[in-house]
């Protein structure tokens, strides 16, 4: 069942004279041993015309019944372009060819099935997805937070020039200021809705007309805040004056006549301890 190595010298004339003539057109006749020998010589002659070699196969075909029945399959796998148009494509032959090619690759690269196992492991392992690098969280200082909060109380939405000025004054970037404002507005909206009031923005997130204060409203609010602070400073001073007045004696309410000092107390005679004289 196996082809042994032979070495023959031949000429093109002899090869042409030995042209194979099929008796029938059955698949058994086309894939018989004689046809195998003929096409093997033809394929080797195309490589080296003066030397026709029929090599011994590296392994036996005992594992595949198709290769045992049709020895020409070994020639087809080595030179598929020579007789691919002569052999009809059947499912059994295609399966045998694929099995033969895989076994040859395994025996040539890594004995013991190491190459096959490595190729299967490479195909089975999915390629890991590259995770996007997370943006580092900005840590604000107390001074920066106070400045941002104070500006937010006055103006809930910043224009580009205002955002640039605020970022430069606090030593931040525009992106950091914008991100902080977005998070602060979300917190503010939740507080407003929790208090039972109407949402200060439209459903798409756009601010309503009344929610954005104008410059006049901002100036009026600043004036009111300054006045309130002035009143708070005056109230403690007035309270201290009232306490001082309450602690002073009420001498101013007493008339001058009654305000004279009282007479000094009269001295009483001290009784003597001596007994009275006897008569």
Swiss-Prot record:
Comp. bias (Pro residues): 261-279
Compositional bias annotation for Polar residues: 118-128, 225-240
Entry comment describing in which tissues the protein is expressed: Highly expressed in adult salivary gland and at much lower levels in mammary gland, kidney and placenta.
GO MF: chromatin binding; DNA binding; DNA-binding transcription activator activity, RNA polymerase II-specific; DNA-binding transcription factor activity, RNA polymerase II-specific; RNA polymerase II transcription regulatory region sequence-specific DNA binding; sequence-specific double-stranded DNA binding
DNA-binding annotation, residue ranges on this chain: 133-192
Compartments, as annotated in UniProt: Nucleus
CDD domains hit by this protein: homeodomain
UniProt key word Nucleus: yes
Protein name (database record): Homeobox protein BarH-like 2
Species assigned in the record: Homo sapiens
Gene: BARX2
